[in-house]
């Protein structure tokens, strides 16, 4: 008999603790071993129960969730899924939690808490399941390294400056899910200001993508923004799919443009990585590079194969550096990947490949 995933739920709301327990205990492969109203109680329960996964509210009394997470990841690293409110402040705190080492997050519904949380049961269970298999990392000073890279002081970024690449024809197309917010940061921060345009589909709910883009914009040398429907796609810019819509690449004459769609979810996701990759295969062909990063499930695998068949060169993040090696594994298994790279070397390999394309970049 397979051992169940032990989950400790930390939330100052008794209702949320009860609902989380109900949802998790309804799954055949997991159970709540204990609940705690605040981090101080949780600290003792961690010692007592040795849970496999912690769900943690971001805002609690006695000790802030971020303070607790920072101490936890330094002293006793373990998989953590954050439980966040759908507010601007909540999104900023959640993104900071992901920087500190949380594996993923699930949002609290704004209204009808009980019905809303029960509707989230499948998503919550999936995230707990993925977290139990995730590689937990210690991340002592992410801001310092990223800020240095953004201002040209990081040693790893220097070689990229020597290869300025300005071309409206070249594009970098990126897809990610669980663990992707930090992976995307690591890919984008070394890019030079004149890098080709980057289009990104990251599985993230509405209300979080704008804060995510703003945070990256403050760390990167390229401009990062949430994509808007119909805007021209320009070099030196990264465009992140809004949490409520699919992002597609389209063309208007000789120009690339961003197209947003409210079509139904694909692979249970909107935005979907497959949708973005397929549009890049159709409209960019050999002019694009495809990059699939850490994530749960198979979204993006089929689309990356379509990009490769259309002439694009494709990358996948390697297993050792992934938080969850799901999407890259599926893409590799389908034969859609040309190069498997560690996250720490992904930007350099992308820029080296772009430099080698030269005159072979073609208008499609």
UniProtKB/Swiss-Prot annotation:
It catalyses: [protein]-L-glutamate 5-O-methyl ester + H2O = L-glutamyl-[protein] + methanol + H(+); L-glutaminyl-[protein] + H2O = L-glutamyl-[protein] + NH4(+). GO terms for molecular function: phosphorelay response regulator activity; protein-glutamate methylesterase activity; protein-glutamine glutaminase activity. CDD domains: CheB_Rec (cd16432), REC_CheB-like (cd17541). PROSITE patterns: CHEB (PS50122), RESPONSE_REGULATORY (PS50110). The active site is at residues 177, 203, 299. Coiled coil: none annotated. The keyword Phosphoprotein applies. GO terms for biological process: chemotaxis. Transmembrane segments: none annotated. The modification 4-aspartylphosphate is found at residue 57. It is found in: Cytoplasm. Its EC number is 3.1.1.61, 3.5.1.44. Residues 165-357 form the CheB-type methylesterase domain. Residues 6-123 form the Response regulatory domain. It comes from the Bacteria. The keyword Hydrolase applies. One of its GO terms (cellular component) is cytoplasm. Phosphorylated by CheA. Phosphorylation of the N-terminal regulatory domain activates the methylesterase activity. InterPro entries: CheB-like, CheB_C, CheY-like_superfamily, Sig_transdc_resp-reg_Me-estase, Sig_transdc_resp-reg_receiver. Keywords: Chemotaxis, Cytoplasm, Hydrolase, Phosphoprotein. Contains a C-terminal catalytic domain, and an N-terminal region which modulates catalytic activity. Involved in chemotaxis. Part of a chemotaxis signal transduction system that modulates chemotaxis in response to various stimuli. Catalyzes the demethylation of specific methylglutamate residues introduced into the chemoreceptors (methyl-accepting chemotaxis proteins or MCP) by CheR. Also mediates the irreversible deamidation of specific glutamine residues to glutamic acid. HAMAP family: CheB_chemtxs (MF_00099). Belongs to the CheB family. This is Protein-glutamate methylesterase/protein-glutamine glutaminase 1. It comes from Burkholderia mallei (strain ATCC 23344).
């Amino acid at each position: 008999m397979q051992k169940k995933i032990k989950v400790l739920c930390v939330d100052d709301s008794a209702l949320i603790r009860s609902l989380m327990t109900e949802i998790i205990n309804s799954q055949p492969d997991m159970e709540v071993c204990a609940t705690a109203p605040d981090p101080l109680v949780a600290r003792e329960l961690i010692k007592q129960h040795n849970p496999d996964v912690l769900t943690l509210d971001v805002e609690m009394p006695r000790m802030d969730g971020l303070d607790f997470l920072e101490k936890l990841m330094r002293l006793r690293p373990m998989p953590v899924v954050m439980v966040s409110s759908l507010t601007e402040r909540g999104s900023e705190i959640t993104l900071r939690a992901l920087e500190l080492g949380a594996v993923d997050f699930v949002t609290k519904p704004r209204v009808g808490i009980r019905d809303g949380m029960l509707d989230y049961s499948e998503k919550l269970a999936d995230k707990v399941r993925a977290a139990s298999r995730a590689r937990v990392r210690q991340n002592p000073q992410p801001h310092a390294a990223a800020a240095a890279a953004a201002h040209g002081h990081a040693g790893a970024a220097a070689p990229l400056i020597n290869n300025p690449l300005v071309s409206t024809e070249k594009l970098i197309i990126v897809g990610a899910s669980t663990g992707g917010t930090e992976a995307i940061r690591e890919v984008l921060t070394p890019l030079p200001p004149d890098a080709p345009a980057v289009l990104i589909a990251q599985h993230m709910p509405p209300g979080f993508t704008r804060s995510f883009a703003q945070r990256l914009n403050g760390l990167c040398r390229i401009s990062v923004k949430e994509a808007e429907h119909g805007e021209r796609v320009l070099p030196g810019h990264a465009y992140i799919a809004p949490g409520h819509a699919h992002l597609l690449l389209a063309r208007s004459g000789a120009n690339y443009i961003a197209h947003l769609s409210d079509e139904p979810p694909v692979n249970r996701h909107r935005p979907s990585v497959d949708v973005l990759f397929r549009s890049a295969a159709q409209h960019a062909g050999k002019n694009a590079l495809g990059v699939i990063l850490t994530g749960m499930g198979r979204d993006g695998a089929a689309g990356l194969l379509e990009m490769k068949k259309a002439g694009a060169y494709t990358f996948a993040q390697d297993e050792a550096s992934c938080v969850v090696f799901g999407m890259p594994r599926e893409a590799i298994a389908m034969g859609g990947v040309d190069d498997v790279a560690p996250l720490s070397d992904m930007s350099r390999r992308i820029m080296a490949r772009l430099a080698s394309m030269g005159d072979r970049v073609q208008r499609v």
